[in-house]
C-alpha cells in the first residue's frame, strides 16, 4: 500500500520495487533483497503519484528517482484489469506461504486467469478482477520435498478451500469494510 497524507494519495503497488525497498515484513521474513540502480513499480490507483510519493519510493529503494519507472492504471481500466490478472501467480505464492509451505521448495510456477472486463465502479471493478483470479485462476507450482508436503499444498491451495468460496468478492469486501 502506498499512501501520502498531505495529498491523500492511496494506491496499491506491485513489481520489483517491492523487493528492492523491503518495506514489507515478508521480504525480511524470507531474508530476500534485490539490489540495483533501477527498478519499476506498477501502481493500481486513480491518479499519478505526486512527486513526494515518487521521491519516497525511490528513497525506500535506495535509488535515484531517475532510476524509478512507474506505471499506473485505475482498477476500472483495461490496463488495470490486466495488471491485476498478472498477479495470479503471486496470489498462489501468498496462499502457499499462508499454508506454511516452505517457499524455497517452490522451484517454478505458471498461472493463468481470465481478464475481467473493465467496469466504471471501483468496488465492482475490484470485485470482478478478484473474482476472475479466485474462480477462474489456475496455478501450477513445481515443488520439491516430500510427497506428504506436496499433497498438503495441493489440497490446501485451491480457493475452494476458503470458507467464503462462492461469494462474490465485492460482497466480501463490503462485509469487511462496511
From Swiss-Prot:
Hydrolase is among the record's keywords: yes
EC number per UniProt: 3.5.4.27
Record-linked Gene3D superfamilies: Methenyltetrahydromethanopterin Cyclohydrolase, Chain A, domain 2
Disulfide bonds: none
Keyword terms, alphabetized: Cytoplasm, Hydrolase, One-carbon metabolism
Subcellular locations according to the entry: Cytoplasm
Main localization of the protein described in the UniProt heading: cytoplasm
Function: Catalyzes the hydrolysis of methenyl-H(4)MPT(+) to 5-formyl-H(4)MPT.
Name the record gives this protein: Methenyltetrahydromethanopterin cyclohydrolase
Organism for this UniProt entry: Hyphomicrobium methylovorum
Gene of this entry: mch
